[in-house]
């Protein structure tokens, strides 16, 4: 019902405000109450200033503002209150719309300046609890699967309030706030927490939710409320509703905080925003924030590192497997009811699954809109045809729970691959799956193929990286050896040392090409380099050939003898440096053969064994 205000706009008016003795179930927003109090106070002042002589036969100025034809009596105050609430109801913004109140209108502009208008945020159905219905008027439902309900009294057409929505109202009304778990005081945020706090004299908050829920519904025959299966489905649906309720509570807190800061924010944007504990406390969630202790605990929990890690992990999991579907608020059971009403035939579980994940090609229903769902369905079809034959009609035939169990590799994370939540858990067991297991290898999914390809690329990258590291180490060692030999040559008055060619380490049974070690075209003996020299060490698969036969055995230090050269002791009978007598380690002789100091070229030729008859054997007399 609408009424015209002074500006010509239509505004909704309340038809009933209840009896005078009954308490108001709706108090209105803060702005509404503030404006109402200001107008009533102004009305009393105007009535008092008019004097007793003006009360008879004359209307006051305040009464003219509210209702020109009404006398200034208590009834005028009631109508003024109703008019103010009607304006405030139109001006109050819904949370989802993000509108702001514009303050008082022209008639109350002066009064509104006394209290600046605040942003009015009103919530819908959050704290509205319907009274219990008579038994014959309650909605008839039937338990399905592990957490689903089928509404028997619904014909599958039109709009209806989802059953989980009604259950969520009961859960919020009987919210236990702070509970004790493991000796610690925490805010209830799991369905099991509802059972940790008593409600009344002989029950808990769980029993209160149970009573409130069955005040709106009744179970169909042959089920009764005493059946364990009914209790199992109720607990499963309540657990799911609590998770969704707490998830949306954080998003609501982020949305309200951002709007109070003057920023636009919706639920999708709030998913990626994490506030601090203080910022959460500055916001509100209507059904939760009035429990001050529980609200403060939840604000601290939402801002903790533990929650951030869990939130980011779950968000990445959802992004990796989006799980796009078209079930909407009806869910699987509601979608089946609408399909039955449209087609006149009760659909099978697979037909509902395909309808909820309908792909682009109607001629190929097995190709769905989501790759993950397509892979699950393909594995299910393979299992069904392997069990019942290649001509089995998998779409319209009876749903095979065992094939669905195998298609998902069991029940990872407690979820069945197809029909999770609508298939009773008692219809499949791990024992039946393993006893009837198939020897046929499972077809790898596209995600597994991507992971395998990434692992192969990583292994190839690691192999290339190791090869580069080895090459760098080889270059570094060669550079260090070159610097070491160059320093030794400068110390003993020799020209800069030229690094000899690197000879590849010969494979067993083969001899290296001695021509790579020959210098100036001289002809040497037929003895291979492997017979003449011992390797100093293998560097990067290559051998350095300039070390003597036993490079690690150093002779004792003698007087007037410089330290041994880094590449080992020089050939027998030769001096370590020019100007020193040659040393012969002959046993018992003690004689030293004086010989002229060799020049540098002779020393290098002998050292590198590049002369035709040079060898490591001592000279013969």
Curated annotation (Swiss-Prot):
The keyword Transcription applies. Residues 1-119, 428-447, 498-530, 549-621 are annotated as: Disordered. Residues 570-594 have a biased composition (Low complexity). Keywords: Activator, Mutator protein, Repressor, Transcription, Transcription regulation, Transposable element, Transposition. InterPro entries: EN-1/SPM, Probable_transposase_24. It comes from the Eukaryota. Residues 82-102 have a biased composition (Acidic residues). This protein has most probably three functions; the mutator (M) function, for excision and transposition; the suppressor (S) function, which inhibits residual gene activity of certain alleles in which inhibitor elements are integrated; an activator (A) function is proposed, because inactive SPM can be activated by a second SPM. This is Autonomous transposable element EN-1 mosaic protein. It comes from Zea mays.
